[in-house]
């Protein structure tokens, strides 16, 4: 084989002139010795290379080549092919300066001729040259090739080539992101990140171009970006406001950009360009990278990364990130508690961002997933370890953060949804109690985020009734969480800390305003149920923290709902607490003392918030008397463990709160005391009937004044007389009139309840006469005799007056009838004549 050969072989000599005119593209051709024999584009290309490679590109000749390319765009592809051949030859011969000149020339041609229709053929040669430079081991060539590719990525092609492939560039740029070269590590990594950004911009804008969202590509791009981000000294101080728009700059010019900051910028751009169907393609390799490199513990980098994702993603797709992270938490249910806790913390940090875009079923779906994880955590562990407890707290915080960014009406729906998932009290196993406690803590987390305006909206019946049932739970922590939930929803004026301890002292920092009409109606309907649940809760435990929590709830209820229409019911509630302390034999002495202290503390509180001075004076007299004779009946509450063997004098009836005295205080203040005088104090374990105590809304005195017929006076009611003359026993109400409300109450009240009430009344009468002292019985009975006598005198006087009025009306009507003319003799006026 000849070392030098001519393009004109002997058999082709007759065609010499035709062959001479044709273009010669063989690099080993000898006709280059005569420039006149070479095509013009080759001569122009050759002229841009200097004699000394160190001198760089010949600018004047480059301008001629550019002008020729613009004038003859059909030659552009051949120019590119020839430059590629020359660069390949120079790279193989290690003449890197000449290869750099060739690459620079192609960059200039690309920038000048990017509007030409024949650019696609030139781009193929351009990309082949970039690939050739990237394949070489010289780092400068790699950086230069990357810069050239970045310039190409900034060009918007009118007719992109859909058969063009970028697999090699993705792989090569990803490998450059992991470079460990000692001298140029940061430069190579920056070049690799810039190259990936160029690929992203070139491909994601057109769906017909190569699908970069495929798993094989994302598994290279995303880990490469995360690898550079995690090498920052402190990722929390990485520049967060880098913009992903605008033309890319060469790596050499970006001297103030670090690989972590640039990688974060590219990740933002990648996530921001992802559509709904491509979000998971980015998240899956992200989660895999965090798992393989064990970056969940500590979770600083994971939180930072997911915040970038949530901020950069399109808002309507943010729910997908939360859903994917929850699925990953499902897949890691066998991982260590620390890993799951870190995952839950990451979830709590980002879930608030997604909450604003999650409405309707998606919001409850997230809540349901979080509750499912809580139930799984409780069911899979027999003993709650500190790590598992931290995991549960992280899930609860995530739930609270999610609910905090929803409107109040959705918070009510979330609380109702959680309440429906709490196990019933009939399930008394340890696991069910743990689950009850955990779910109620979740409910408390949501409740603390809710701003109560109207109690009717904050306590719908479907939510309040099961909550009050949980207030009677035998498990102390469960009851205390329920009390905290009630406190969070009742406290509209931030009085919870002011009323956090039982006291008889003034509350100067107490904030109060009169309740609205809707709140009063709510108290009429459900106040009795709430107070009954509080009494039952107080009787279940003698622990100071449990009793203090119940006192706090009762105090908030009084402060928020106290007014002239509700004060009598609250006084019956206080008397009920005292009655439980006096009559329930199963309670310990310390427990009874604590209940007496709570009752006097609530009495002082209601007398202050209601502004009834007579009531306050009476309460202060009891406090002073107890301070002298029985300090154990006053706050602070006694510790059962410290005073287990100590005995207390509990038979001190003269230091108890007297119902008649309370009624006199109200009457002296000009208020109606009928409900207090005739109603029975709350008792222990009384069944909740919303209509049972509804009669206290109406004034019984109105009913009595309407019963003024003679027939009512002839009817003897033995129960009324016996009960009225019995001390400490409430008087049985007269039969109500048959109006709509009375019929509704009669239908709602079961027959068994009336029988049970009758038996309790009889037992109470017998107990009073057996155990009470004679002087006490006389003292309590005498005022009632006077009251009955006065009432009878009023009735007889009213009957006498009515009889006189009736007789006078009869005489006047007869006289008028005799003077009137018959109707047939009446003459019509002329106005009605036709």
Swiss-Prot record:
The record's family statement is: Belongs to the EFR3 family.
List locations, semicolon-separated.
Answer: Membrane
Identify the stretches annotated as HEAT repeats.
Answer: 120-156
Q: Which residues cross the membrane?
A: 595-612
Question: What is the tissue localization of expression for this protein?
Answer: Expression during embryogenesis is ubiquitous with notably higher levels in the CNS and brain.
Please report the name of this protein according to its UniProt entry. Protein EFR3 homolog cmp44E
Q: Which domain of life is it from?
A: Eukaryota
Keywords, in A-Z order: Membrane, Transmembrane, Transmembrane helix
What GO terms fall under cellular component here?
plasma membrane; presynapse; synapse
* Purpose of the protein: An essential gene required for embryogenesis; required for cell viability.
Q: In which broad location class does this protein mainly occur, judging by the first location in its UniProt entry?
A: membrane
Q: Which SUPFAM superfamilies match?
A: ARM repeat
Instruction: Quote the Gene3D superfamilies the UniProt record gives.
Output: Leucine-rich Repeat Variant
Pfam families in alphabetical order: EFR3_ARM
Membrane topology of this protein: Single-pass membrane protein
